Structure formats: structure tokens, C-alpha cells
């Protein structure tokens, strides 16, 4: 819902107001002076103040800030709910700019007024660059004694964090134990060298000897075989690039009109992804793009816009879906979305009679059908097209290898757009290596709440309580039971347990007409509890259904659980997922891991994370075959993917592959300063690990700045040691881009050694030696020394950053 100043006070009690624009009242976490100005203004304003906020993350941050300063706003749904005795309120609505209602003496403030840093639309991460690190698992999820991989020393076991002080310098270290009890202490500034090990079960993970030669031998051996695999993948890529496709042209006026018909405001992620899709479709090379976004994040709208572009170019669109229910759902949505345009949309599934199917085939051939949405029937050999231009594959993980082979044969020269919430490992692998283009929608729609997930042993009392809570607020419930032969018994049992509920069943073995009727009735709220199989896993989108109960949840795959849970939480109401097991003590270890994973990922955008965790649970054989999976077991998935990506980059750029280039030694930094997030600042170890890893994996300075502001917002002013940590992260980032081998410095001298001078501004380097010969000295052909007397660590680090920026040829 969008609110304007003319609309927000539309209630009869408050009308005809005069308004004035606000002064500069930004809440800026990096500027205490402005904070004080804002607070002073809020304290002194004589009337009511309403904070009109939308994004959940921003809402929490603003409320925390206000409460720290003794301002406790009360939540209201409507303007008329304001109370005389209270001065501060907040509501979940969207206004573009804050203003003052002078007539009623009300100050309205929006998110934009308070958090310009965090919602600046100009900063949208480059999707391709961000995906470079998608195979880097989150270190904050590390568990004591679980395997980790250090790129230089091999696979050991994580033993926690420890703070060590030497010569008055404090630093925090990640501790890894190796064979024979040896321990490695990794400075937190070097966490980019560490990743959780994934390749086989925890129990069977290798354990290397610290200082031994086995690890280096293994890396060298595998890096050679990786080259062959890289060449194979590049052959696939080159084959795709050599094909001739159709270059779509955009009629800007028509396209903008279609976009304006959208009933909701698209997120910045959706807009950015659509730019990539439009760019792909405009090229005379067939598009092959994977869009990964959680359920309900707006992938369908992107598919609709791509379809509109295709139809505008007189091309047909095929939308391939795994289930009849999803086909029905898309058919309804596409019909509504294209209702203002002369576009003929049809559906092909088992719900159509043979006569209807024959007519559809006829109209597909003669071009009367512009967009067809169908199940596996779209893969029939006898289907002919007039002018097919775009294939959209939804829920790609539901299609098997045989289906993929048919798609390759039938649809080899057209644009392909793949949509998924949980990509299968093979697709994930191709996306990670850049063979398949990848876009991620990570930002949820405004006002969407994360689903609360609970895992419990079976309990009739709990089931009754859960269902009654939902139907008492006018909602609906999915009850998943995946054995058709017993589903009637479940319905009888629930009818006795909850007589207040109206219950019906739905499953894939019902007659088409009966299943269609049940689903339509549930959609139209004719009953409130649907007992069904996983038939609703894809394609059911009902805003009122906000509770799902899954019996025998330990029998489901991780992707299945995520998809089922995604059927709820599509409105602004809090949604609940109850996963039931018969006996915790009797479920398998893999089932426990799946349930732990699904319950831990209740945040938005969890599908991608779950794909990685699914990979960890099931192993990697599915991705690359037996030989490669054996290599991955020996060195871990993360390093294997790094080696593969390095090999692909070398081959793409026409460089000669060498083991040395593939396994270049990581940058070493030793700056003799205290740099850590003290436990007095962040108590929780995993939270500290999370921020350490974020800093270590940053690929832009702007990302480091964002992390800095995130720390300040959540935990307050940065301690001096933490300021040093931020600066060292920037030094590492720039030094790595230049090609520095190591950089060492104390308060008196410093040494920089280069791998090569490829990215160095040699002109600037020569000027330094000529201008300040007492400071600079060339020790070897690749090593320079500088003499520096700065006792303040912070100033010294800033000086080094400035030096590195000047040394870098390109603008960082």
C-alpha cells in the first residue's frame, strides 16, 4: 500500500491539513552531531510524532535507537488510533518523504528521513561480483570439533576463538587442531583463508598433519585434474556462446506501461535482476540465466516481464512447471497480469481433455497462442511451434536428468530463464563457475515477516492448539501427510480432534475435476484446513494460509521442506511452520541435520543457504561424478571450487595454466597492531565470527564501510582495536588487488614485497624514491622498505592505505 500526504489522513476525524517539508533530520550512525539535532527536535516538538516505517530491519534499528534515548513509540494500525496521553507512535506503512501536518500538529517521519545510509538505492551490489563468494559457507555456523579447511595447512578441527596478547598487542585468533595434537592460531584478519570443510560426513573428514607435505601434494595433484574439468565446462560455455539466437528489442513505451500495471512495488533486487535479463535478451546469443530467489520474493513478476518482451517481439513463450497446481496458479496470475494486453495465454496439463490438448497443439503451431504454461507435456516430441523465443523453467530442481536432456534437444537455440528457490547442486556448480549466468533476489518484499519454524514430537494437543490459533484469526492451515492410503484416516482423526475446523483432503490420485474443485474451494476460503500430500509443494499461493503442519517431517528432503514451508507467509501476518516427528531418538542422523538446517534458516533468502547445506548433508557425488567427488573429499568443496574458478579464469583470459598460478600463496599481513572485536563489545563468539568473516570476504571498500556501520548500529561506537580491524580489512583488499605478496610494518619501518608489478603504478613508485630517498629503499627487485615514525597505530594504518591506493594503477 502506498500512502501520499493527501491520503494518509483520509479519516473523517482528520482532514484538510496543511503540511510543510522537514528540515534535514537524518539519523546518521556516523554523525553524533546530527543524532543530537534529531533527538533535540523530537523532544521539543509540541505535537504527536508518527514514525511511518516499512522494512523490518530498518524498523528494528530505528526503534532500538529511539528506546536508547527514552523514546518508546506505540504501534498503531491507523491514524485514528492515536491516543491523547501518548506522544510517539509508529505504523507499518510507506510514505516517500516525512512532513508536518500543521493543522493537526502531527510530525510524520519515514525510513528515508532516518536511515539514508542504509536504504540508498544507488548502492546495489553487483550481482555477478557478489556471487564470487557464494560457495563460502558462513563461519558463524561453526561448531566446536567440526572440520575446517585452511588453504595453506589443510583440514583440521575447529576449537574456538581465543585472544592472545604479545608485546602489548592484542589479537583474536581462530584455533584449529591438527593430527598429533598440533594447533594453528589463525589471526581473524586472515579468516579469508579458512572455510568450513564440506566433502564428506563430519566423521570421515580428513585430518592433516601440521607442517607435513601431504596437503601440498594433494593440492598440486588435484589442481592438475581441475584444469581438465575447467576445459570441459568452458567447452559447454563456448558452445552456448557460438549459437545464434534472437536479439529482442524493447518498445520502451509499451514495456513501461506493462511494468506500471504491476500491483506491488518491486524491490531493488528485482529491478537489478530484470536489467540483467533485458540485457541478455537483447543479445543475439541464447540467454541461459538462473534466477535464485526465495519463495514469494517476486521471481514470477520477472518471468512476466520477460514474457511481455518476447511477445512484443512476436515470439512465443513456453513456461515449463513441474505440477498441475503450479500450472493452474501461473495461468491465473498470467491471465490477470496480461488482462490489459492482446495476449493469448493457455495451459497444458492433465486437467485438459485430449480434445482440448489437440486444439492447444494446433494453436501453438499456427501461432494463435502467445504464452503457454504447461507441465511435462511441453516436452512431448509432437509439439510444434510457430515462433518460439523464450523458455521459462520454474522450480528447476523438480525436473530430472532425462527432462533436462529433452530440453537441450528441443529448446537449444532459444533464450532460457530458470527460476528456483533451491538450485540443485549441478546447477549451483555451473552458476558458481560462471558457466551459467546467475542472479540472486535476496531482498524480501516490504512488510513480509520471517516464518517461525518449530520442530516437535507428535502431539494431538499441540496440533489442536496450532490449528485453532490460525483459524481463530480467520486464517487457513495446510496439514501435510504424504501417504495417500492413510489420508482419510488422518482426516477423520483431525475432525474428531478439532470439530471447530472445516476439513477437506487433496492429493494427486484424485480425479482431476475433484482435485481442481477442492483447490478452488480452499483458494476461495470455503474451508479452513486442507489435509494434503506434497502436491501443494509448488504452485499454491494463498495469502490467508499462514500455518503449515508437516507430519513425519524427517522423511522429507531439505529442498522439499523449504518449498512446503514457502507455501505460507505470503501476507503481512506472522506465519508458523510446525514440523512433527514421531520419535526424536529414532530418526536418522541425516534427518536430524535436515531438520536442524531448516529450523536454523528461518530468515529471508534461506533457499540458497539450504542448497549449500543440502550439499553438505548429501555429499558432492551428484555434482561432478565419482572422480571429482573423490578430489573434493580430500581437499573440501570450497577449495575445489576456488581452484576450478581460477582455472576457468586463466583459460578464459588466454593465459597458460600452471599449478603455481592456480595455487598462488595468499597475502600475508603483519602490522603489529591490536585488531579485534573485543568480547566486551560483542559477547557472543558466533556473532564475532560472523563479522570477522564478512570483513575477510569483502570484495569492495564500500562493503567494509557497510559492515562498519552495521557494527556501530548494533553494538555502539567502535573500540580503537575494532577501528584497526576495519582499516586492516581495507589494506588486505587493496594489497590483494595490487598483487602484494606480504606487507609488514611496525611504528618505525615497513616492508612490502610484490608478486609482480602488473598492477603497480611504477611512475608513482619512482617519484617516491626520488622525492624521499631517506624514507624509501629498494631492497630487492620485488621488495621495498620504508622508514616511518608514526606512534599512533590508527594514523599509520591510514598512511598505509593511502600509499597502497597511490600504488594501484586502477581507481579502487
Curated annotation (Swiss-Prot):
The gene is mfd. PROSITE patterns: HELICASE_ATP_BIND_1 (PS51192), HELICASE_CTER (PS51194). Keywords: ATP-binding, Cytoplasm, DNA damage, DNA repair, DNA-binding, Helicase, Hydrolase, Nucleotide-binding. ATP binds at residues 293-300. A motif (DEEH box) lies at residues 394-397. This is Transcription-repair-coupling factor. Its EC number is 3.6.4.-. Gene3D superfamilies: 2.40.10.170, 3.40.50.11140, P-loop containing nucleotide triphosphate hydrolases, Transcription-repair-coupling factor, D7 domain. GO terms for cellular component: cytoplasm. Residues 462-621 form the Helicase C-terminal domain. Couples transcription and DNA repair by recognizing RNA polymerase (RNAP) stalled at DNA lesions. Mediates ATP-dependent release of RNAP and its truncated transcript from the DNA, and recruitment of nucleotide excision repair machinery to the damaged site. Residues 280-441 form the Helicase ATP-binding domain. GO terms for biological process: regulation of DNA-templated transcription; transcription-coupled nucleotide-excision repair, DNA damage recognition. In the N-terminal section; belongs to the UvrB family. Transmembrane segments: none annotated. It is an enzyme of class 3 (hydrolase). The keyword Protein transport does not apply. It is found in: Cytoplasm. GO terms for molecular function: ATP binding; damaged DNA binding; DNA helicase activity; hydrolase activity.
Amino acid at each position: 500500500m502506498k500512502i501520499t500526504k493527501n491520503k494518509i489522513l483520509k479519516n473523517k476525524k482528520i482532514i484538510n491539513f496543511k503540511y510543510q517539508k522537514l528540515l534535514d533530520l537524518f539519523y546518521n550512525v556516523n554523525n553524533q552531531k546530527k543524532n543530537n539535532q534529531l533527538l533535540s527536535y523530537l523532544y521539543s516538538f509540541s505535537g504527536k510524532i508518527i514514525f511511518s516505517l516499512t522494512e523490518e530491519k530498518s524498523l528494528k534499528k530505528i526503534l532500538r535507537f529511539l528506546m536508547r534515548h527514552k523514546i518508546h513509540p506505540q504501534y498503531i494500525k491507523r491514524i485514528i488510533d492515536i491516543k491523547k496521553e501518548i506522544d510517539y507512535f509508529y505504523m507499518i506503512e510507506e510514505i516517500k518523504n516525512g512532513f508536518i501536518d500543521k493543522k493537526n500538529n502531527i510530525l510524520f517521519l519515514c525510513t528515508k528521513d532516518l536511515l539514508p545510509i542504509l536504504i540508498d538505492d544507488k548502492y546495489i551490489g553487483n550481482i555477478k561480483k557478489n556471487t564470487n563468494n557464494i560457495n563460502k559457507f558462513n563461519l558463524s555456523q561453526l561448531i566446536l570439533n567440526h572440520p575446517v579447511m585452511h588453504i595453506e595447512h589443510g583440514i583440521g578441527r575447529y576449537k574456538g576463538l581465543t585472544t592472545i596478547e604479545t608485546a602489548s598487542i592484542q589479537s583474536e585468533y581462530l584455533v584449529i587442531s591438527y593430527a598429533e595434537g598440533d594447533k594453528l592460531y589463525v589471526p581473524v584478519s586472515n579468516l579469508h583463508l579458512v572455510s568450513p570443510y564440506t566433502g564428506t560426513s563430519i566423521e570421515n573428514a580428513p585430518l592433516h598433519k601440521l607442517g607435513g607435505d601431504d596437503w601440498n601434494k594433494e593440492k598440486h595433484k588435484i589442481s592438475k585434474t581441475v584444469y581438465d574439468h575447467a576445459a570441459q565446462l568452458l567447452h559447454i560455455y563456448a558452445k552456448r556462446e557460438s549459437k545464434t539466437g534472437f536479439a529482442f528489442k524493447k518498445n520502451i513505451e509499451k514495456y513501461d506501461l506493462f511494468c506500471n500495471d504491476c500491483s506491488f512495488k518491486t524491490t531493488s533486487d528485482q529491478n537489478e535482476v530484470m536489467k540483467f535479463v533485458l540485457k541478455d535478451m537483447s543479445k543475439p546469443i541464447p540467454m541461459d540465466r538462473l534466477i535464485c530467489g526465495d519463495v514469494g520474493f517476486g521471481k514470477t513478476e520477472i518471468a512476466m516481464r520477460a514474457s511481455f518482451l518476447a511477445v512484443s517481439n512476436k515470439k512465443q513463450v513456453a513456461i515449463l512447471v513441474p505440477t498441475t497446481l503450479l500450472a493452474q496458479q501461473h495461468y491465473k496470475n498470467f491471465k490477470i497480469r496480461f488482462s490489459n494486453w492482446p495476449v493469448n495465454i493457455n495451459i497444458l496439463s492433465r486437467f485438459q481433455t485430449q480434445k482440448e490438448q489437440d486444439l492447444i497443439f494446433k494453436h501453438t503451431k499456427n501461432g494463435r497462442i502467445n504464452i503457454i504454461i504447461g507441465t511435462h507435456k511441453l516436452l512431448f516430441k509432437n509439439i510444434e511451434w510457430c515462433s518460439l523465443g523464450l523458455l521459462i523453467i520454474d522450480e528447476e530442481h523438480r525436473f530430472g536428468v532425462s527432462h533436462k536432456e529433452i530440453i537441450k534437444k528441443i529448446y537449444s537455440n532459444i533464450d532460457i530463464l530458470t527460476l528456483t528457490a533451491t538450485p540443485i547442486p549441478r546447477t549451483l556448480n555451473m552458476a558458481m563457475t560462471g558457466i551459467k549466468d546467475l542472479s540472486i533476489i535476496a531482498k524480501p518484499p516490504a512488510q513480509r515477516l520471517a516464518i517461525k519454524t518449530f520442530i516437535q514430537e507428535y502431539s494431538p494437543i499441540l496440533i489442536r492448539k496450532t490449528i485453532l490459533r490460525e483459524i481463530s484469526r480467520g486464517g487457513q492451515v495446510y496439514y501435510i501427510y504424504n501417504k495417500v492410503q492413510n489420508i482419510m484416516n488422518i482426516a477423520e482423526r483431525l475432525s474428531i480432534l478439532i470439530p471447530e475446523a472445516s476439513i477437506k483432503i487433496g492429493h494427486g490420485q484424485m480425479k482431476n475435476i475433484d482435485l481442481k474443485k477442492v483447490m478452488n474451494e480452499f483458494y476461495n476460503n470455503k474451508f479452513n484446513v486442507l489435509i494434503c500430500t506434497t502436491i501443494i509443494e509448488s504452485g499454491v499461493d494463498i495469502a490467508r494460509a499462514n500455518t503449515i503442519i508437516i507430519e513425519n517431517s524427517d522423511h522429507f528432503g531439505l529442498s522439499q521442506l523449504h518449498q512446503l514451508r514457502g507455501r505460507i507467509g505470503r501476507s503481512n501476518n506472522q506465519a508458523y511452520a510446525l514440523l512433527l516427528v514421531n520419535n526424536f531418538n529414532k530418526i536418522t542422523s541425516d534427518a536430524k541435520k535436515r531438520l536442524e538446517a531448516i529450523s536454523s534458516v528461518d530468515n529471508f533468502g534461506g533457499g540458497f543457504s539450504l542448497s549449500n547445506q543440502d550439499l553438505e548433508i548429501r555429499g558432492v557425488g551428484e555434482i561432478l561424478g565419482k572422480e571429482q567427488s573423490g578430489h573434493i573429499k580430500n581437499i573440501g568443496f570450497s577449495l575445489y571450487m576456488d581452484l576450478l574458478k581460477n582455472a576457468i579464469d586463466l583459460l578464459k583470459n588466454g593465459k597458460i595454466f600452471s599449478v603455481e598460478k592456480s595455487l598462488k600463496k595468499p597475502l600475508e599481513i603483519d602490522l603489529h597492531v591490536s585488531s579485534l572485536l573485543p568480547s566486551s563489545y560483542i559477547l557472543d563468539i558466533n556473532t564475532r565470527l560472523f563479522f570477522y568473516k564478512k570483513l575477510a570476504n569483502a570484495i569492495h571498500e564500500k562493503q567494509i564501510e557497510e559492515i562498519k556501520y552495521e557494527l556501530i548500529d548494533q553494538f555502539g561506537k567502535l573500540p580503537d582495536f575494532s577501528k584497526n580491524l576495519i582499516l586492516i580489512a581495507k589494506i588486505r583488499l587493496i594489497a590483494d588487488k595490487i598483487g602484494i605478496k606480504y606487507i609488514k610494518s611496525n611504528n618505525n619501518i615497513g616492508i612490502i614485497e610484490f608478486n609482480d608489478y602488473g598492477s603497480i603504478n611504477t611512475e608513482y613508485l619512482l617519484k617516491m624514491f626520488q622525492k624521499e630517498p631517506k624514507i624509501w629503499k629498494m631492497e630487492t627487485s620485488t621488495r621495498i622498505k620504508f622508514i616511518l615514525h608514526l606512534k599512533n597505530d590508527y594514523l599509520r594504518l591510514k598512511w598505509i592505505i593511502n600509499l597502497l591506493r597511490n600504488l594501484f594503477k586502477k581507481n579502487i
